[in-house]
């Protein structure tokens, strides 16, 4: 475990932010740097079949050390960090034996406060790794990477019985492209776990059904002084569209299993406006109903417009709830829960109010629930991870490998 923190700090020092709207995968050069570093480390550890695809998926195998027909299992994390907050020049702070209260994030006014983040009350006495208030930390998902790498080392050094262990590190998860170029056949695992979750004990096998909605509004601009009966204000139409979207079904008003509509971007002029929504729901029927609702709104607002003015709506599904695929293989969750209990952790099955590579992989034939990393407050300057949580994640990964080997 002594190298766990060292690995993590090494990985977060690299800027691996992904970038939306880029055709190439990985979308940024920084991701390649981390992938090449990990490839070198895996080879130094003696793993076999170490491959790095042209689309930036790194795979490797820790060969079984016991005979028998043991199913090959996998562990997966992503190398990119969120585009939502800078990942350049990350300067982690290590707070040992946290005693409560506010934690100053670097030099300035930014603090990590238990008033805003009550989970801190549960972490007294632990070692917290925070940001300096200027960037995100990158625990999402470099904590997962460090934990997988450390677990591999533990399995080797302690000669713990295990079958074939596949590992993979993927790019561009944060922009929804992480699993699109994942070769499930080449990975050759019966099932896998993404290590991309949050607090200790979290085990996730349900996620949102997700879609994006892009709306193009074409109006007609003339001088405001002579506009009566002629001007069609695209911005006004955009405002009318958003006014029709249920205000109490937005991200800031929902939790748990509740779905939402989220206006993620809007820009425009009188002549042309563009809106970008994301739609999320755990229930497939409700998900489809939300998409229909957006089409109905666009049709209603666009009714009676001049033929040269129009509203164009394009809906694209992003991913689906992996629950329907994972529940077909209950032993995958049983093993993970037993591993946690064996490590004195009470499993907490909860839905992911988001998505992971595992969601897409589950529909590609690789059932893939999500394990905790020990991290919190992802995608922003209040992100942090506990060293103890990371150590627990390593223990659970190792125990899953051990329990799987006992299922001969």
Swiss-Prot record:
Q: Give the GO biological process terms.
A: peptide catabolic process; proteolysis
Give compartment(s).
Cytoplasm
State the SUPFAM superfamilies in the record.
Bacterial exopeptidase dimerisation domain, Zn-dependent exopeptidases
Q: Which InterPro entries match?
A: ArgE/DapE_CS, Bact_exopeptidase_dim_dom, Peptidase_M20, Peptidase_M20_dimer, Peptidase_M20B
Give residues annotated as binding Zn(2+) 2: 140, 174, 379
Binding residues for Zn(2+) 1: 78, 140, 196
**Obligatory cofactor(s):** Zn(2+)
Family, according to the entry, reads as follows:
Belongs to the peptidase M20B family.
Its protein name is Peptidase T
Q: What is the lineage of its organism?
A: Bacteria, Pseudomonadati, Pseudomonadota, Gammaproteobacteria, Enterobacterales
> Which gene is annotated as encoding this protein in its UniProt record?
pepT
């Amino acid at each position: 475990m002594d190298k766990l923190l060292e690995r993590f700090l090494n990985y977060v020092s690299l800027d691996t932010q992904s970038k939306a709207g880029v055709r190439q995968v990985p979308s940024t050069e920084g991701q390649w740097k981390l992938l090449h570093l990990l490839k070198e480390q895996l080879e130094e550890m003696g793993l076999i079949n170490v491959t790095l695809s042209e689309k930036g998926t790194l795979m490797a195998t820790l060969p079984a050390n016991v005979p028998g027909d043991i199913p090959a299992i996998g562990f997966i994390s992503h190398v990119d960090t969120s585009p939502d907050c800078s990942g350049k020049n990350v300067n982690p702070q290590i707070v040992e034996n946290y005693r409560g209260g506010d934690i100053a994030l670097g030099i300035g006014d930014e603090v990590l406060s238990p008033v805003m983040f009550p989970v801190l009350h549960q972490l007294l006495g632990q070692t917290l790794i925070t940001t300096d208030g200027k960037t995100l930390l990158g625990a999402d998902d470099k904590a997962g990477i460090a934990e997988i790498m450390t677990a591999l080392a533990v399995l080797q050094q302690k000669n713990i019985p295990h079958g074939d262990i596949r590992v993979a590190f993927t790019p561009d998860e944060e922009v929804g492209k992480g699993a699109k170029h994942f070769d499930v056949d080449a990975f050759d695992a019966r099932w896998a776990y993404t290590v991309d979750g949050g607090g200790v004990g979290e085990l996730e096998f349900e996620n949102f059904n997700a879609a994006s909605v892009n709306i193009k509004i074409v109006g007609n601009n003339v001088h405001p002084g002579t506009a009566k009966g002629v001007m069609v204000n695209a911005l006004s139409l955009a405002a009318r569209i958003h006014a029709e979207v249920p205000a109490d079904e937005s991200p800031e008003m929902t939790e748990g299993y509740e779905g939402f509509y989220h206006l993620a971007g809007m820009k425009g002029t009188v002549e042309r406006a563009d809106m970008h929504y994301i739609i999320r729901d755990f229930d497939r029927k409700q998900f489809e109903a939300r998409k229909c609702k957006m089409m109905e709104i666009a049709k209603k607002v666009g009714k009676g417009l001049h033929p040269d003015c129009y509203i164009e709506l394009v809906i694209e599904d992003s991913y689906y709830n992996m629950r329907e695929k994972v529940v077909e293989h209950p032993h995958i969750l049983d093993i993970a829960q037993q591993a946690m209990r064996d490590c004195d952790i009470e499993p907490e099955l909860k839905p992911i109010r988001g998505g992971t590579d595992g969601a897409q992989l589950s529909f590609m034939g690789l059932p893939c629930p999500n394990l905790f990393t020990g991290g919190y407050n992802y995608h922003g300057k209040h992100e942090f991870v506990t060293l103890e949580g990371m150590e627990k994640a390593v223990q659970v990964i190792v125990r899953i490998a051990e329990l799987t080997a006992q299922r001969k």
